Amino acid sequence: MKHKRAIPNRGLRVADQIQRDVAGLIRELKDPRIGMVTIQAVEVTPDYAHAKVFFSVLIGDPAECAAALNEAAGYLRNSLFKRLQIHTVPTLHFQFDRTTERAADLNALIHQANATRAKDADDQPGATEA
């Protein structure tokens, strides 16, 4: 009896395809609470039962957008059934991705540290000359 072999990186490929398809399907939604949404990443469980869809919002309230996307998750999943060629299409769970906010905060902290360092460097040579 032959056993099925696992296809290498299948989970990653399925997640990538879901990301592309969900991004296209979201553009078709008519809900005004869903603004300019970017799908950042998708994480699929090994059994393909659930998928976390991480998104960011350019304009609009992230909480309202998450609520609207989670309400539309059933419609989106049904549409994925028609597009994907897999046995189990995962249940979609939308989560706001704070990576861009954290990156902006870190960038501001780095800029502030560099400005402080430059100010300290300017102050030290003047103090040693006097």
UniProtKB/Swiss-Prot annotation:
Major localization listed first in the record, in broad terms: cytoplasm
Gene3D superfamilies: 3.30.300.20
GO BP: maturation of SSU-rRNA
InterPro entries documented for this protein: KH_dom-like_a/b, RbfA, RbfA_dom_sf
Keywords, ordered alphabetically: Cytoplasm, Ribosome biogenesis
Pfam families assigned: RBFA
Record's GO cellular component terms: cytosol
One GO molecular-function entry: ribosomal small subunit binding
Coiled coil: none
Localisation: Cytoplasm
Family to which the UniProt record says this protein belongs: Belongs to the RbfA family.
Subunit structure: Monomer. Binds 30S ribosomal subunits, but not 50S ribosomal subunits or 70S ribosomes.
Role summary: One of several proteins that assist in the late maturation steps of the functional core of the 30S ribosomal subunit. Associates with free 30S ribosomal subunits (but not with 30S subunits that are part of 70S ribosomes or polysomes). Required for efficient processing of 16S rRNA. May interact with the 5'-terminal helix region of 16S rRNA.
Protein's name according to its UniProt entry: Ribosome-binding factor A
Organism: Methylibium petroleiphilum (strain ATCC BAA-1232 / LMG 22953 / PM1)
Higher taxonomy: Bacteria, Pseudomonadati, Pseudomonadota, Betaproteobacteria, Burkholderiales
UniProt gene name: rbfA
